[in-house]
């Protein structure tokens, strides 16, 4: 596993490269539809501005020992995208409209402030709990949360503009840490959208070999799920893929059916059950 310092440096490099990408983005591309249903490319950037401000505030408070929810926010662990997706979509559009021509400049300023804050955390500060609606999170793991966010939203933008877009391989270890440790908006709980209770649970097994290995079962009961590392029971469906496909599936960027049809996801077991996986794991 990479150290905090190594992950922090990778996050910083990726964030700065993403800033450069936006500096060179033609004006016409800012008004294109992104992979996020309700957002233009510029709306995605406005969302990143808002999260920069939130992360900076919650980490600054957390390292001072203040971890209570800000006014208007749910208790840590009580928030979920199903409760806030519509409001989030509208607020990001409103922020983009308000920022106007200063959107890029504001994004870079807020992003750089957050980069300096997160990469400058001391070893003691990294362990201090900080508020997030998804869960309490050690300050140091906000590096992983922001890294994941930057890379996924980069995919949301680039996949809508370029013929081939993928996830940065440098980010995959941070994403796996978030999933396995169940941290806030990087967790499977955040990605899972509850449905009707199933009479019989479905056991999905992931066998991910590279570049970051993951072997785990996700047992879906319709209205809830559980994550079982290294489970030994027989699976209903076994998925085999690279880590970037695993991440895109978990965070709802591609469906299981699409990944199967494009040859990115190998399946053992019931094809119908395999394709149903994405009705539960939608991300935001």
Annotate the PLM regions.
Residues 22, 48, 52-59, 63, ...:
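A generic secondary-structure signal for well-formed alpha-helical elements
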Residues 197-243:
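Glycine/small-residue-rich hydrophobic helix-like segments
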Residues 1-6, 55-120:
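Short, helix-capping/interhelical loops that line the mouth of catalytic, cofactor-
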Residues 123, 139-215, 279-284:
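Acidic, aliphatic-rich amphipathic alpha-helical segments
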Residues 1-9, 30-51, 91-103, 130-148, ...:
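Alpha-helical scaffold segments that form or flank carboxylate-/histidine-based iron centers
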Residues 86-87, 111, 115-133, 144-160:
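A short mid-domain helix/strand-loop element embedded in enzyme catalytic domains
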Residues 19-40, 61-65, 120-136:
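Helix-loop segments that flank and shape redox-cofactor active sites
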Residues 231-284:
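C-terminal interaction segments
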């Amino acid at each position: 596993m990479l150290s905090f310092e190594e992950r922090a440096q990778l996050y910083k490099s990726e964030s700065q490269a993403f800033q450069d990408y936006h500096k060179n983005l033609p004006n016409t591309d800012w008004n294109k539809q992104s992979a996020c249903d309700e957002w233009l490319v510029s709306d995605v950037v406005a969302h990143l501005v808002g999260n920069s401000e939130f992360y900076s505030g919650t980490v600054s408070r957390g390292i001072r020992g203040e971890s209570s929810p800000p006014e208007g926010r749910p208790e840590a662990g009580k928030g979920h995208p199903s409760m806030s997706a519509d409001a989030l979509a509208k607020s990001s559009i409103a922020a983009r409209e308000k920022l106007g021509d200063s959107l890029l400049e504001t994004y870079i300023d807020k992003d750089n402030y957050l980069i300096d804050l997160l990469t400058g955390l001391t070893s003691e500060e990294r362990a201090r709990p900080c508020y997030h609606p998804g869960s309490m999170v050690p300050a140091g793991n906000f590096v992983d949360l922001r890294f994941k966010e930057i890379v996924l939203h980069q995919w949301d933008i680039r996949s809508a503009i370029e013929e081939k877009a993928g996830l940065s391989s440098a980010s995959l270890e941070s994403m796996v840490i978030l999933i396995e440790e169940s941290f806030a908006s990087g967790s499977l709980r955040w990605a899972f959208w509850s449905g009707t209770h199933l009479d019989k649970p479905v056991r999905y097994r992931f066998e991910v070999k590279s570049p970051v290995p993951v072997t785990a079962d996700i047992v879906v009961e319709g209205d809830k799920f559980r994550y079982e590392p290294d489970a030994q029971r027989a699976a209903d469906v076994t998925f085999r893929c690279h880590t970037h496909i695993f991440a895109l599936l978990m965070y709802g960027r591609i469906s299981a059916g699409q990944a199967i049809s494009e040859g990115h996801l190998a399946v053992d077991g019931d094809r119908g059950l395999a394709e149903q996986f994405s009705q539960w794991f939608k991300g935001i």
